[in-house]
């Protein structure tokens, strides 16, 4: 809906003091963007992975609804990203690989089921910057992060930001904890 897009852009441009431009098509968003961040509640992929350009990073935020699908309340898994995006990604990272098996996010589980990508080729967020994950090895690589459950990295970042804002605003209370040497050694 053009009015919703325009109203959203106006409201959040003012709120965050950034320019938000409403567009008509996914192609307009993807073309020339360094980062494509998806945060919806859809069960239909948002764009065709063939539109991706070298060097782009994609993040998919949508959570799983696999239990609703298995119990018959929904006919398909939620997914923002299509199979082609998963295929084209040179590096795929999720928060915790195990959640691909337990939560079955459509964005990754379906391409794995179809044999388009391999579970073993997906890295965990905590592996980035270690010998376990090569990370981006070329500026031309397309990278994809699927925000799955099960990793406190994002929670820690949010908590740190909340702490900084509260501290800057003079809010909150400082709690004293026992020093490690004062704690019982056996539990």
Report each predicted region and the residues it spans.
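NAD(P)-binding Rossmann-fold cofactor-contacting core
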Residues: 1-16
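NAD(P)-dependent dehydrogenase/reductase Rossmann-like domain
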Residues: 3, 7, 113-187
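A short helix-to-beta-strand connector/capping loop
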Residues: 16-20, 139-140
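Short acidic-hydrophobic, aromatic-tinged amphipathic segments that line or gate anion-handling sites
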Residues: 18-28
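Rossmann-fold NAD(P) dinucleotide-binding segment
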Residues: 28-35, 42-59
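Glycine-rich nucleotide phosphate-binding loop and flanking beta-alpha elements
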Residues: 43-45, 65-66, 100, 152
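Rossmann-fold NAD(P)-binding glycine/threonine-rich loop
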Residues: 51-137
């Amino acid at each position: 809906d053009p009015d919703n897009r325009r109203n959203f852009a106006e409201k959040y441009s003012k709120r965050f003091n950034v320019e938000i431009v409403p567009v008509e098509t996914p192609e307009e968003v993807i073309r020339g963007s360094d980062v494509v961040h998806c945060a919806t509640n859809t069960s239909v992929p948002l764009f065709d992975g063939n539109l991706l350009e070298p060097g782009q990073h994609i993040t998919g935020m949508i959570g799983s609804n696999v239990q609703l699908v298995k119990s018959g309340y929904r006919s398909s898994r939620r997914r923002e990203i299509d199979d082609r995006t998963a295929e084209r990604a040179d590096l795929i990272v999720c928060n915790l690989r195990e959640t691909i098996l337990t939560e079955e996010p459509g964005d990754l589980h379906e391409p794995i089921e179809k044999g388009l990508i391999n579970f073993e080729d997906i890295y965990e967020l905590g592996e980035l910057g270690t010998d376990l994950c090569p990370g981006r090895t070329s500026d031309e690589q397309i990278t994809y992060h699927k925000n799955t459950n099960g990793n406190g990295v994002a929670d820690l970042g949010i908590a740190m930001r909340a702490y900084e804002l509260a501290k800057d605003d003079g809010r909150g209370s400082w709690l004293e904890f026992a020093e490690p040497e004062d704690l019982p050694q056996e539990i």
